[in-house]
Amino acid sequence: MAAKDISTEVLQNPELYGLRRSHRAAAHQQNYFNDSDDEDDEDNIKQSRRKRMTTIEDDEDEFEDEEGEEDSGEDEDEEDFEEDDDYYGSPIKQNRSKPKSRTKSKSKSKPKSQSEKQSTVKIPTRFSNRQNKTVNYNIDYSDDDLLESEDDYGSEEALSEENVHEASANPQPEDFHGIDIVINHRLKTSLEEGKVLEKTVPDLNNCKENYEFLIKWTDESHLHNTWETYESIGQVRGLKRLDNYCKQFIIEDQQVRLDPYVTAEDIEIMDMERERRLDEFEEFHVPERIIDSQRASLEDGTSQLQYLVKWRRLNYDEATWENATDIVKLAPEQVKHFQNRENSKILPQYSSNYTSQRPRFEKLSVQPPFIKGGELRDFQLTGINWMAFLWSKGDNGILADEMGLGKTVQTVAFISWLIFARRQNGPHIIVVPLSTMPAWLDTFEKWAPDLNCICYMGNQKSRDTIREYEFYTNPRAKGKKTMKFNVLLTTYEYILKDRAELGSIKWQFMAVDEAHRLKNAESSLYESLNSFKVANRMLITGTPLQNNIKELAALVNFLMPGRFTIDQEIDFENQDEEQEEYIHDLHRRIQPFILRRLKKDVEKSLPSKTERILRVELSDVQTEYYKNILTKNYSALTAGAKGGHFSLLNIMNELKKASNHPYLFDNAEERVLQKFGDGKMTRENVLRGLIMSSGKMVLLDQLLTRLKKDGHRVLIFSQMVRMLDILGDYLSIKGINFQRLDGTVPSAQRRISIDHFNSPDSNDFVFLLSTRAGGLGINLMTADTVVIFDSDWNPQADLQAMARAHRIGQKNHVMVYRLVSKDTVEEEVLERARKKMILEYAIISLGVTDGNKYTKKNEPNAGELSAILKFGAGNMFTATDNQKKLEDLNLDDVLNHAEDHVTTPDLGESHLGGEEFLKQFEVTDYKADIDWDDIIPEEELKKLQDEEQKRKDEEYVKEQLEMMNRRDNALKKIKNSVNGDGTAANSDSDDDSTSRSSRRRARANDMDSIGESEVRALYKAILKFGNLKEILDELIADGTLPVKSFEKYGETYDEMMEAAKDCVHEEEKNRKEILEKLEKHATAYRAKLKSGEIKAENQPKDNPLTRLSLKKREKKAVLFNFKGVKSLNAESLLSRVEDLKYLKNLINSNYKDDPLKFSLGNNTPKPVQNWSSNWTKEEDEKLLIGVFKYGYGSWTQIRDDPFLGITDKIFLNEVHNPVAKKSASSSDTTPTPSKKGKGITGSSKKVPGAIHLGRRVDYLLSFLRGGLNTKSPSADIGSKKLPTGPSKKRQRKPANHSKSMTPEITSSEPANGPPSKRMKALPKGPAALINNTRLSPNSPTPPLKSKVSRDNGTRQSSNPSSGSAHEKEYDSMDEEDCRHTMSAIRTSLKRLRRGGKSLDRKEWAKILKTELTTIGNHIESQKGSSRKASPEKYRKHLWSYSANFWPADVKSTKLMAMYDKITESQKK
């Protein structure tokens, strides 16, 4: 559509009509405004109370300043419940420097932006907007991401194309002065109270004219925020942020306020949100910690004491240097704490060293004076004594007190005992979940204020800052560094991310909170923590074990490796004397190392807790969904336990959704509104639909009304994030104040929400939590009522949730309401959970703190699922009046008929009364031996069976038709090939296309069917691991290869390798024939040259000699097609298998017990040149060990392996300099600092990267096998000075040893790409001309003094000091033209290249003089043959080209001078 066809109104309102400019990134819907996004003023920003932070997508990857893959390269097989915050963040600023010395009096350290901290005013809506979102029905396993990216504290800001262009065209200074955040606004004091402005919606110009703005500047902290007018700000960077702020906070705010449909309650919510936002910014003015101090020189020659200040709720990377005088006035207590830390006598360097025997245990009968901040209870003092007793014996243990008994306080107090009573000053490390980090910090501040405890979290820059300023007292010391802190508090994620840094420290004590996370001995977290050098370990968990004996073995083995053997499972369904004896023996062995106390035993003052199950009918809509789910999955249900586990589990999840709320299904809301409100989206209809469509919501609505009236405060737990969204909509429409916490809420906002809810004057009535994210160590005891909206498979998760309110410090009786839908799977799940709890506590009574050992998984197996699904299903097919019951529901009746549910039996640690206790809870199992045919009514059953039979008949007919079609197609192809008719082959393609999808499905299910995807996976695996015959089962198990039969993969592997050999053999044969033919022509041509029939100066460029030379140096990848996959590299396959086989044999035969001891011995490979890290022979050995361990191309794993020790010497994610890339194509000169954008600068990219590592490994493998001359390794490609020297002739290798030009794994280009593209990257130097052999990629063409680097695409001179004239000549010369011109005297060039090491000095001088004369004479005869350059200029080009063959580095001008001198002497 042309612009003229668009109306003026549309053009003036592009956001309203969905228009955007083509050169801009598409606007993304955002829930909260982030005014740092100054480059996209067309965003239509949506408000939502559910999301506190902005989702930011950084489209400019080259400006990313994070640690790289992230976290994408991190292992994620053991993930956390609450730490998946990757999508939340703050903008990144370019050229930000770390905190360092400043010379200005004010704070000039570049703080990182806090734009994401700006949660905006909520624009109230009159109806739900949930249908506009992508629905997420998943149970809240998003919290299960162990790798929570705490970079959400401060992530990247998406930079617009305009800003990128501006940044590259006009580089900003290190600390530019610009707008970081616009915080607030007010009317100018010169105006009246805005009588007119308040009644109209201002435009952007009015906002600029009439308001002042509170600005946070980019180069200063929030302490230096200033009020500015638009005119006083001037033209500074970030001015567009001011425009965005005006649109969002003034214009849109006024539009909402003037909307006649907006209620007073909505405006009140907006005002409260604005106040909350401003209160949050006030927090950024408060110093939280003083990190360091310095004496800075000012411009007037004086000096000033400055403090490096970390601000409250901001990360370490936003710390700034401030005038100490100002900070002393602002935060004197923090200054005192800093001084105390600087003068501390409990630094780790002052620790006592108990080498032989530790001091004997001395019981603490009273609370020692160094445990401050409160009074320990007797059982807590007992816990400290128990931990001290274990330490004295050198043992480790599990603190398994029930939730809410103060395990955190006991651990902190024990660390204080270690430091003050045993002089074990640290460093100690505590690993905790993200959600509990604030609670741990508060506990240290209260109970151990004298300890230096640092919180190790945040983005990469924050952690770098922590390591630089908080880790060592002497960070710049070359020798041993001394630790500065006593305790390091961190999360699981950073154990994995910074395993190398943290794992290199010797820790005196390690505590792991929520230690059931270590139940999987194969997880990356377990492996990482187990590799730490720790003197003592303590595991902390309120739910010691949740599944089986194997998990108990993992925990015990983590504490005391090899001390216990626990391998026998326990079956409580079939108990016998032998098993009972085993339990008692297990109890006896483990009892000393596990301390487990229950609240009922040790805390008599704790208020009671009552749990009630409230059963409610399904609504008509829910019943319809429930019934449809059962009938539409008839075939899967009838398979029962014989069927697939996952299919039944999916049905179970769908039924649980139907039991909760129909809005969890697509398009359900529209149907409900049609029923309850004639389809009208009014506020009343939306609220009525939300409530009346779900039985639980009807009950919850009445329950919350009653609870609020009685002054209670409520925690509502659900497993489903989407259910929390629905509850949030309900509370918002009802005008109920609430907080929310789930895996999508970033850490900073979590703490704010918890503190806001717990504050004495809080007006929050409800806290919405996901069962998992909200069930880990959070203290919400200001609430006295818990509502479990839907029960978890694992009863421990619900117990964790209840313990948020029922814990020490709670003063009120705690009521727990568990909502259950009648006659649904929820009732049976609850019953089975009840049995699990009874058994668990029975086992605890025997001393074995294992939970659900009778099942191997929390989730039931297929047989159990089938039984659970049948429960209550029959009632779904009978007519009911549930909807009428819901409309007439009486809360008192429901409460009177509620069932009391005991989740914490009155048993404790007593060994008495076990049998009697179990008898009290005997339950009658629901017999699930009936059939689905008995559940579903006969009429519907007959209909389902008819449909099922019809479907089977159709499938049979379809299969027969497909067979006939394939037979017909085969006959037609044979017929067409015989008749020579190629056009008819595709005549029936339309008919055939209908069966392709079914054939693909059939192949996917066929274990012996190998398709293109399997072939590609196999090809990549060969390039990575070499010979796969012995590891096929491992590759299939870990997902590297799709699941197919071993035998078929073995056959395919043999076929692929055979095809590769045949392809190489054929290529060799063809090449040999062509070379023989060209050699004959070249011989005849040489004869003509010798006889004078053809003059050397008149010979054409395209002559037989040139063609032969080009063919000899030609190097193209040998590609072949295999089973539909095109362009597989034959040479790479063959050579990789041989190389890796040689490496494996070498290490296994000599270093099988410890591969890390592998050594190159006396063989010294050629050193690398100009790599960014100090790369020696030792690093080469570690690199080969890494390839042996992880496979070729697994650079990330090799880099991250702390045992290899090359973590900081590999740079895989450095960003290329886009300016350098652009200029490299037009510049052949040596990069100089004065020429911006020419070549590669030292800051553009660090090496080695993936490509360099691949080439280095290729060289090392060939070096080991004796296939490379050590004088010219390929690993030096990419260095700024390439070695020159004589290069041996190499005979062409056999086919199975040759290699392709492009290393497939290491290069960013695909391995099977077109060969022509790879050939373009080859250097076109004279070495290829003079070499009579076909070159291997491991033996590159002898490098020119200025050649193209395949690593970065720029030309790099071997002689940086060469004159500018020579560089200019080489810039303009046509190297290809020079090569053709000089090809006639290739013998002389070749003789020069060979050098004269074995010759007498005089003899060599004579040869040099002869060959130089020959070259010079030829140049003189050819200098006028160029059409592009003048004779004199072309003469310089030819000499410059010839200088590359001189055996030493020499300028072409010197060669010209030498030739002129020889010529003059000859004339005389």
UniProtKB/Swiss-Prot annotation:
Pfam families linked to this entry: Cdh1_DBD_1, CHD1-like_C, Chromo, Helicase_C, HTH_CHD1_Hrp3, SNF2-rel_dom
Matching SMART domains: CHROMO, DEXDc, DUF4208, HELICc
Protein's UniProt keywords contain Cell division: no
Record domain Helicase C-terminal: where: 699-860
Chain residues that bind ATP: 401-408
Motif DEAH box location, chain numbering: 513-516
Cross-link type Glycyl lysine isopeptide (Lys-Gly) (interchain with G-Cter in ubiquitin), residue numbers: 1144
Stretches with biased composition (Polar residues): 126-139, 1297-1310, 1354-1364
Entry annotated with the keyword Kinase: no
Deletion consequences: Decreased sensitivity to the cytotoxic effects of 6-azauracil.
Compositionally biased residues, Low complexity: 1221-1234
Compositional bias ranges of the Basic residues kind: 95-111, 1287-1296
Domain of life per record: Eukaryota
EC number assigned by the record: 3.6.4.-
Domain Chromo: 195-257, 285-350
Subunit and partners: Component of the 1.8 MDa SAGA complex, which consists of at least of TRA1, CHD1, SPT7, TAF5, ADA3, SGF73, SPT20/ADA5, SPT8, TAF12, TAF6, HFI1/ADA1, UBP8, GCN5, ADA2, SPT3, SGF29, TAF10, TAF9, SGF11 and SUS1. TAF5, TAF6, TAF9, TAF19, TAF12 and ADA1 seem to be present in 2 copies. SAGA is built of 5 distinct domains with specialized functions. Domain I (containing TRA1) probably represents the activator interaction surface.
PANTHER family on file: CHROMODOMAIN-HELICASE-DNA-BINDING PROTEIN 1, CHROMODOMAIN-HELICASE-DNA-BINDING PROTEIN 3-RELATED-RELATED
Domain notes: The 2 chromodomains are involved in the binding to the histone H3 methyllysine at position 4 (H3K4me3).
Note: Present with 1620 molecules/cell in log phase SD medium.
Descriptive protein name: Chromo domain-containing protein 1
Lineage: Eukaryota, Fungi, Dikarya, Ascomycota, Saccharomycotina
